[in-house]
């Protein structure tokens, strides 16, 4: 895709759930108006990009209500038609109704939600009753034709029960996307739930094994992305690419930020959609310069790393969270990324080069088939799925 562009729309930072490790909700947060949506469209008319993806995030985006999306989706779809807009949403599904589901289905909005495994694990991390409320919303979304995938947040506590969590996703037939609990720029105790990088790396290797063992019955999106990174030598999701200048978030009042993770923190405001800032103006703001400084830091600090092309130092937010807000290192999960990249790379090498050829006769050698699916089998599966 040429010149991809991602705009995260944060209708509100409010959220009815009380996840214990959450850093992106804010009580009493205002809700975005349709007028602000129109301002977003007008702002984007001055942005030269061929495609754009809009992700409704939060907080909890469904708090904006059915009327908001009934108006916002056609305004964006028609106003940004030249950019061929796609849509997505990240929601806990508590406020999903048949009415909202029909509105979202009309615009083919895929849903990302959050379940941390079996009910007791989920509720211990996200609050009593979370699991049942989300599953109720999931049923409504599914029955109205919406595609739903789940993010599973692994904390330093739940990672100890990884086998139960994988078994849950396998039995439910859910596509799994892993998210490690992260330190936060907003928290007074940022590491209370955070998964340590070394443990995260070992978890990724475990999930690689599980994805390959259950290759025909389970999909783990992170493993797909990581294998694609190593195989193509290019990052395929925002964590492993230079996101600065191609990803922005718009808060409820129209303020523009480098990413949804910064929304609500005034020191990271880059501009406002009402002022129609150019990309150059946004990147010249203090927070824009900070993002570019991270890119420059990675070029120097990671210049000799063989994974730099498809890692790019990881996530800038993760890098700034421990300091806080200063660039003094790369993403702390560097240890985990190296661990899984090395593991995938070594398995690819073994699969492609280590096995001696078998003689098929007529001078035609054939590679010996592995006894169980490997990384190449996963790459073939992804290629067939498009």
Where are the predicted features?
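Radical SAM enzyme [4Fe-4S]-AdoMet core and its adjacent flexible, acidic
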Residues: 10, 128-135, 139-244, 249, ...
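Radical SAM/AdoMet-radical enzyme domain recognition
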Residues: 41-55, 64-185, 192-195
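Short, flexible loop/turn elements at secondary-structure junctions
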Residues: 11-15, 60, 91-95, 117, ...
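Flexible mid-to-C-terminal extensions adjoining Fe-S/redox cofactors in radical SAM and related proteins
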Residues: 263-386
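Canonical Radical SAM [4Fe-4S] cluster-binding loop centered on the CxxxCxxC motif
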Residues: 2-35
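Cysteine-centered iron-sulfur cluster-binding motifs in ferredoxin-type domains/subunits
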Residues: 11-18, 60-63, 302-304, 308-309
């Amino acid at each position: 895709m040429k010149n991809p562009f991602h705009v995260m729309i944060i209708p509100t930072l409010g959220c009815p759930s009380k996840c214990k490790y959450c850093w992106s909700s804010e009580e009493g947060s205002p809700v975005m108006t349709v007028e602000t949506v129109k301002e977003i469209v007008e702002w984007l008319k001055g942005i030269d990009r061929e495609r754009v993806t809009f992700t409704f995030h939060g907080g909890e985006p469904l708090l904006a209500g059915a009327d908001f999306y009934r108006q916002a989706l056609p305004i964006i779809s028609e106003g940004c038609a030249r950019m061929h807009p796609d849509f997505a949403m990240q929601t806990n599904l508590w406020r999903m109704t048949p009415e909202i589901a029909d509105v979202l289905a009309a615009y083919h909005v895929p849903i990302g939600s959050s379940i941390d495994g079996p009910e007791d694990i989920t509720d211990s991390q996200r609050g009593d009753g979370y699991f049942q409320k989300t599953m109720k919303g999931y049923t409504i979304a599914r029955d109205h034709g919406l595609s739903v995938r789940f993010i599973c947040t692994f904390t330093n506590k739940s990672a100890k029960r990884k086998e139960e969590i994988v078994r849950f996703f396998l039995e439910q037939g859910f596509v799994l996307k892993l998210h490690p609990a992260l330190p936060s720029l907003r928290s007074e105790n940022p590491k209370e739930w955070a998964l340590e990088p070394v443990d995260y790396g070992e978890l990724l290797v475990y999930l690689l094994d599980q994805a390959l063992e259950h290759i025909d019955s389970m999909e783990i999106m992170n493993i797909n992305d990581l294998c694609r990174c190593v195989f193509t030598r290019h990052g395929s999701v925002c964590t492993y690419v230079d996101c600065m200048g191609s990803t922005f978030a718009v808060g409820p009042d129209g303020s523009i930020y480098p990413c949804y993770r910064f929304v609500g923190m005034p020191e990271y405001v880059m501009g406002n959609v009402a002022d129609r800032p150019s990309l150059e103006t946004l990147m010249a703001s203090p927070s824009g310069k900070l993002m570019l400084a991270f890119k420059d830091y990675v070029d120097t600090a990671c210049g000799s790393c063989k994974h730099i092309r498809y890692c790019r130092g990881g996530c800038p937010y993760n890098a700034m969270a421990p300091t806080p807000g200063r660039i003094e290192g790369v993403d702390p999960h560097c240890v985990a990324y190296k661990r899984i990249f090395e593991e995938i790379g070594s398995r690819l090498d073994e699969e492609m080069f280590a096995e001696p050829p078998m003689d098929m006769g007529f001078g035609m050698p054939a590679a010996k088939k592995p006894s169980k699916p490997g990384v190449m089998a996963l790459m073939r599966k992804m290629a067939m799925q498009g």
